[in-house]
A protein has these predicted regions:
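Short, small-residue-biased leader/transition segments that mark boundaries at the very start
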Residues: 2-3
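Glycine-rich hexapeptide-repeat left-handed beta-helix
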Residues: 6, 11, 16-24, 28-38, ...
């Protein structure tokens, strides 16, 4: 669903199978609507729903997680599998949130952040390998 360019997906972002990406157009009382803005190097797990939210660079959305309108996932932050980040909630940088509704569990350490970055590199290499294979 794209309304006047209201969905943006950044470089090297990976969206897994079965995920839903959606936005809401402007409407009375909400002249800007709820665009979906996904930064660079983001990982979105299988069957996730991201709906009119913002995911900053290197954010992570776990399998089956939901992020609602105007929610924000900070840089290097992780929304756990199955979590629901409700409307207007804001996750800070390097935070782990889980539950329904999602709440902050803790800050992420360097090892967790590096693990997410390794995932980005893995999927980026998969894309390059696939592109090379179909050219041959």
């Amino acid at each position: 669903d794209v309304y006047k360019r209201q969905i943006r997906i950044g470089e090297r972002t990976n969206v897994q199978d079965g995920s839903i990406l959606h936005c809401d157009p402007p409407r009375p009382g909400d002249p800007d609507g709820s665009p979906l803005v996904i930064g660079d190097d983001v990982l979105i797990g299988h069957m996730a729903m991201v709906h009119g939210c913002t995911i900053h660079d290197r954010g992570f959305v776990g399998l089956g997680a939901i992020a609602m309108n105007k929610a924000v996932i900070g840089s290097d932050a992780m929304l756990a599998a199955g979590a629901m980040l409700t409307e207007n909630k804001v996750m800070g940088e390097r935070e782990l949130w889980a539950g329904r509704p999602a709440k902050k569990l803790r800050d992420l350490d360097d090892a967790a952040v590096m693990g997410m970055r390794a995932g980005v590199m893995h999927y980026t290499q998969n894309a390059k390998d696939h592109a090379a294979a179909i050219k041959s």
